[in-house]
Swiss-Prot record:
One example of a Gene Ontology biological process annotation: apoptotic DNA fragmentation
Family stated for the protein in its record: Belongs to the DNA/RNA non-specific endonuclease family.
Entry protein name: Nuclease C1
Matching Gene3D superfamilies: Extracellular Endonuclease, subunit A
Cofactor: Mg(2+); Mn(2+)
Lineage start: Eukaryota, Fungi, Fungi incertae sedis, Mucoromycota, Mucoromycotina
């Protein structure tokens, strides 16, 4: 409108995000929190076949040159923080080529995660569960991201409290995974999970963290699968066993 043209004649402040396309994933990076709002992947049995010479030991954590320097997360932000640089789109999902794997090590794809008991264990096993779904389903769509959830205090008031590494990188209180699989005849099933960013006993059933899609949407401000009639979506955990295993090929 003419009014908005006048107001924004010197510039539009923007959406505080960068949408970036990689070889094995897409990402919406949140410039304020310096973590991804979401990453999206399409996994298949073929996409998970390891290419010749692909080795995660050849990959190095690095700043994302596609994010303006003012808004980047840096190696210094994470150094000595006590938190792992946790992949949102896992390296273990990007095994087709070395560049694909290298791209998962951009810091834009990292969120600060508790290491022992979470990033290196339960969360890694959940990543393995997502990969294992390709044995049963032709296509597996996975969306992953951080959440900052409120807690209720003794005074009955809700607050959101989280660390910020070096005053730059927000440490999420929780993380979500939303998974979509086909069930034939243009039907689909989904699973949505919200996990706390803390050590989780390996024996804890994955279904303890199962939530409704709208729970993730309300907490994240995102909308998933708006090109589908979500009221018709089946339950992933009815279509297959939703469980994590320490032998499930997890990936930190």
């Amino acid at each position: 409108s003419p009014n908005s043209e006048s107001i924004l004649q010197f510039g539009d402040p923007g959406t505080a995000r960068d949408f970036l396309e990689r070889e094995s994933y897409v990402i919406s990076y949140n410039r304020r929190d310096r973590v991804a709002s979401w990453t999206g992947e399409h996994l298949t049995a073929d996409s998970l076949k390891t290419g010749d010479g692909v080795d995660r030991d050849h990959s190095k954590f690095k700043e994302d040159p596609d994010v303006p320097s003012l808004f980047r997360s840096t190696l210094a932000d994470y150094s000595g923080s006590g938190f792992d640089r946790g992949h949102m789109a896992p390296a273990g999902d990007a095994v087709a080529t070395q560049p694909a794997m290298d791209q998962t090590f951009y810091l834009s794809n990292m969120s600060p995660q508790v290491g022992i008991g979470f990033n290196r264990h339960y969360w890694a096993y959940l990543e393995g569960f997502c990969r294992s779904l390709t044995k049963k389903f032709s296509d597996v769509y996975v969306f992953t991201g951080p959440l900052f959830l409120p807690t209720k205090g003794s005074d009955g008031k809700y607050t959101v409290t989280y660390n910020v590494l070096q005053g730059n990188v927000a440490v999420p209180t929780h993380f979500y995974k939303v998974i979509l699989v086909p069930q034939g005849d243009n039907k689909y099933a989904y699973g949505a999970f919200i996990l706390p960013n803390q050590a989780i006993d390996t024996k804890t059933p994955l279904t303890n963290f199962k939530v409704k899609l709208t729970d993730v949407e309300k907490a994240s401000g995102l909308t998933f699968f708006d090109k589908l009639d979500v009221s018709t979506l089946g339950d992933l955990c009815a279509a297959t066993t939703c469980a994590v295993s320490s032998s499930g090929g997890g990936d930190a």
